[in-house]
């Protein structure tokens, strides 16, 4: 009897094995695996993400980038004719940004109506400035004040150890 039960269990397991093997060879499974591999291999970069968000607005969106360093890395690739850049130019001395100052100084002057307009609100604000926890927190707070209600704040590599 025990031998018969073992044979039955073996037959059942073998039946599942054959069904699994058959499904692994099916066109649907193979096509799905190819699609998964393609999706997993995709890599979006910050410029693509920012330009996608900017494309969601009906009009020319207002864009602000905090922490530009080298404009050819991202800022110059942004598809908006109304864009502003802020960077003190510490790492890239010849940085041709709109506002060569810290983000704290920029937001302070903006609030005081000393640069641009204190009523200005941005559709997309990209925060990629000083990567210290305290500064990222300040940049987010300032960005929240100056982003439109239907706008976006995008953060880049701001998971600092501090």
Pin down the residues of each PLM region.
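A short alpha-helical cap/connector motif
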Residues: 1-162
């Amino acid at each position: 009897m025990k031998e018969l039960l073992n044979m039955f269990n073996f037959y059942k397991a073998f039946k599942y094995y054959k069904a699994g093997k058959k499904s692994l060879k099916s066109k649907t499974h193979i096509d799905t695996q190819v699609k998964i591999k393609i999706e997993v291999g995709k890599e979006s970069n910050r410029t693509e993400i920012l330009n996608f968000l900017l494309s969601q607005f009906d009009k020319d969106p207002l864009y602000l980038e905090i922490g530009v360093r080298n404009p050819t890395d991202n800022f110059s690739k942004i598809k908006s004719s109304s864009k502003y850049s802020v960077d003190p130019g510490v790492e890239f001395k010849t940085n041709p940004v709109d506002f060569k100052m810290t983000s704290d100084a920029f937001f302070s002057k903006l609030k005081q109506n000393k640069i641009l307009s204190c009523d200005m609100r941005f559709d997309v604000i990209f925060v990629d400035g000083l990567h210290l926890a305290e500064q990222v927190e300040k940049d987010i707070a300032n960005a929240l004040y100056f982003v439109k209600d239907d706008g976006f704040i995008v953060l880049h590599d701001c998971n600092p150890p501090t």
